[in-house]
Amino acid sequence: MKQIFDVAIIGGGIVGLAHAWMAARRGLSVVLLERTSVAQGASVRNFGMVWPIGQPDGELHAIAMRSRHYWQELGREGIMEVQECGSIHLAHRDDERAVLEEFRDLPLQPVTMLTPEEVLQRAPLANPHGLLCGMFSDSELRVNPRIASARIAQWLAEKYGVACHFNTLISTIDGNVLYAADGREYQAARIVVCGGSDIQLLFPQWIEESGLKLCKLHMMKAIAQPEGSRQAVHLASGLTLRHYASFQGCSSLLALKSRIAEETPELNHYGIHVMASQLPNGEVILGDSHEYGDDITPFDKTEIDELMLREIRKVFRLANWT
């Protein structure tokens, strides 16, 4: 017998949960179908950064700020701790400082330039050696990615009656009917597929024709740092400036990109830039790298670890690197 809903959502990560929330708050009946007992994909493996500073001015930044508002609402609901931590982009090279100063002068997002002393007051994890300045933005938030998805799913079930069906693998979609591997059937007027890379299993031909490529990120986690090395603010390095679209309008970025391509082309090859987020328990998430398409393997590359650590040590200072 089919279970009938207004909306069926495949995937219990942040994207699926967001669609479930928006549908449920409009009064629609919603079923959330997740193939594992709890979300285990990108939603739980990342920094826990809510990062409006990375989005370019216009529609995308407006969407990011709207997302920020919803995360704050989750915090007010007591679902999880949502910290208004902000972010600091560090400059250890002259070309990095030039980009930050140009970005500050653009009529885009409100930011504040910090002296090295001001940076270290807010961010003891910043490496003072060669530090030229920092750029502070107050729009970024921090959540714990390990617990966020599970907490939100529980809240959606309790507050809105969202039917969260875990350990439910959808193997086929035919029209508005979804078939689970265990024989259960679901029917919905609208179906939203948010299963991450699992979309290849449901729509392999569409993925092939779309030209989309998978992206594998790699990051590391350091153990809890001592009390004197605790901070709330997110950190990003000069390498990050070439990664996010918000900085692409800075004419000074070209010199930075050229210098990196000449000095350290291996960083471009693996899409490496450097960021840090410290969780409330003192652990530090560090990263990250980006591999695309056919370059992706199920194995971690020691070379990537070594390159990331090399760059991380230039801009961050941890009391314990274990």
State the predicted function of each range.
Residues F5-V31:
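N-terminal Rossmann-like FAD-binding beta1-loop-alpha1 element of flavoenzymes
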Residues A222-R230, L253-T322:
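Flavin-binding catalytic cores
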Residues G12, G54, H92, G195-G196:
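Glycine-rich, N-terminal phosphate-binding loop of Rossmann-like dinucleotide-binding domains
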Residues I173, R184-S277:
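Flavin-dependent oxidoreductases
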Residues R25-V44:
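Glycine-rich FAD pyrophosphate-binding loop
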Residues F47-R122:
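Dinucleotide-binding Rossmann-like beta1-alpha1 core, especially the glycine-rich loop
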Residues A62-I63, L90-A98, M135-Q154, F299-I304:
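Short beta-strand to alpha-helix junction loop
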Residues F136-N176, Y186-R190:
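Helical element adjacent to the flavin cofactor pocket in flavoenzyme catalytic cores
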